[in-house]
From Swiss-Prot:
UniProt entry keywords in alphabetical sequence: Methylation, Mitochondrion, Protein biosynthesis, Transit peptide
InterPro entries listed in its UniProt record: PCRF, Pep_chain_release_fac_I, Pep_chain_release_fac_I_sf, Prokaryotic/Mito_RF
Protein name, entry field: Peptide chain release factor 1, mitochondrial
Keyword Transit peptide listed: yes
PTM per Swiss-Prot/TrEMBL: Methylation of glutamine in the GGQ triplet is conserved from bacteria to mammals.
One annotated Gene Ontology cellular component of this protein: mitochondrion
Organism the protein comes from: Kluyveromyces lactis (strain ATCC 8585 / CBS 2359 / DSM 70799 / NBRC 1267 / NRRL Y-1140 / WM37)
UniProt subcellular location: Mitochondrion
Principal localisation: mitochondrion
Function: Mitochondrial peptide chain release factor that directs the termination of translation in response to the peptide chain termination codons UAA and UAG.
Length: 396
């Protein structure tokens, strides 16, 4: 049993359990809690039972097939984690028993630890309850905050970053709508659709206020300005799937649909038909306006897709709030709408204020190539918080 390893005093006597996110600090082993290891062992036994059932000619319905696939991924991750922990244990024993091999063992440990922690994080994510919209595509809404025209330019930069990120991962995307400022140098509002299943789970922690510190091109005295932009990340709900739990059929008295002529720049851009659509959802007060397409039908479909996404996210947040309020101790959350990240151009630094992760490569992040470094750090931090809550619930 791998859980017994965690009880060996010499092995873990000096191991720091605190999670480290700053990339400049030394890497240390972050062992999973023994209760989580026991949980993984339960999944191993459950998978064996399903395999025995299959070997005996038992029938597998759709639910059993889904469960088999889920358990297989967990057990595979657990097996890899256990193997790497055993390697780490052997190297630690070499350090204690054979001083002549100390330098080589230390080098091997330094090479092993990043992979071991990454494997542990992957296993932890599989052991935690999944996000209700983990498999959904995503819709990103971006709007400038404080900072005037520089905030609008920064909003355009963030939009480009997410498009670059989607291209880097070869995800399909399209702009649902984009409204530029008068000069065309910045964005007043942009709505980006990333049509990749699971992209919501990957991007959900991008929601919040992003802050930039840099010298604007129009600044003659070289002073650094601070501007902000707000990002909203929504799950894209199915439009036709009857099995989707959040698929809605709106009652006539819930929705008001207004159609009108689209506004434009004049000339060929003026739409002479009533193609623009505005939806008003009375129960929530949400209003969606859409005029990007020349077809009223397409504008209406896009507007309803955004409305479904906003309502689904609203219901999820309300449910989480009720669950938090039901606990005796208030649980910290990463769903805050305040400043989440700073992009400091003079220092070439990006810092996520929720988990404390810092990366010195703004260009790599804005190109989409290193955004995963920031996202993964926040994801690991969130998983740690969820694991703590899960352990509290298990011991209650």
């Amino acid at each position: 049993m791998i859980s017994k390893l965690f009880g060996r005093g010499k092995f873990f006597r000096n191991v720091a359990l605190q999670v480290r996110f700053n990339s400049s600090e030394a890497v240390e082993f972050r062992p999973l809690h023994s209760s989580l290891i026991s949980r993984a062992e339960l999944y191993v036994n459950e998978l064996r039972e399903l395999e025995d059932l299959l070997s005996q000619g038992g029938s597998f319905d759709l639910e059993k097939q889904k469960n088999f696939a889920k358990l297989s991924t967990i057990v595979d991750s657990y097996s890899k984690y256990r193997e790497e922990v055993n390697q780490y244990k052997e190297l630690q024993e070499i350090l204690e028993l054979d001083p002549s091999l100390r330098e080589e063992a230390e080098a091997d440990i330094a090479a092993l630890l990043p992979d071991l922690n990454k494997t542990g994080d992957s296993l932890l994510n599989k052991l935690l309850p999944p996000h209700p919209f983990a498999d959904k595509p995503s819709i990103l809404e971006l709007r400038p905050g404080v900072g005037g025209s520089e905030a609008m330019i920064f909003t355009q930069d963030l939009l480009n970053m997410y498009i670059n990120y989607a291209n880097y991962h070869k995800w399909k995307w399209n702009l649902i709508s984009k409204t530029e400022n008068a000069s065309g140098s910045g964005v007043l509002e942009a709505i980006l659709n990333i049509d990749e299943p699971g992209s919501y789970d990957k991007l959900k922690f991008e929601a919040g206020v992003h802050r930039v510190q840099r010298v604007p091109a129009t600044e003659s005295k070289g002073r650094t300005h601070t501007s902000t932009a707000a990002v909203i990340v929504l799950p894209k709900m199915g439009e036709e799937s009857e099995s989707d739990a959040y698929e809605r059929t709106f009652k006539p008295d819930e929705i008001r649909i207004d159609v009108m002529r689209a506004s434009g720049k004049g000339g060929q851009h003026v739409n002479t038909t009533d193609s623009a659509v505005r939806l008003t959802h009375y129960p929530s007060g949400i209003v969606i306006s859409m005029q990007e397409e020349r077809s009223q039908h397409r504008n209406k479909a896009k507007a309803f897709a955004i409305l479904r996404a906003r309502l689904a996210e609203k219901e999820r947040l309300e449910k989480e709030e009720k669950e938090r309020n039901a606990r005796k101790d208030q649980v910290s959350t990463t769903d805050r709408s305040d400043k989440i990240r700073t992009y400091n151009y003079p220092q070439n630094r990006i810092t996520d204020h929720r988990c404390g992760f810092t990366l010195y490569d703004i260009e790599g992040v804005m190109k989409g190539e290193r955004l995963d470094d920031v996202i993964d750090a926040m994801d690991a931090f969130s998983s740690e918080q969820k694991a703590k809550q899960l352990l509290q619930d298990m011991s209650a």
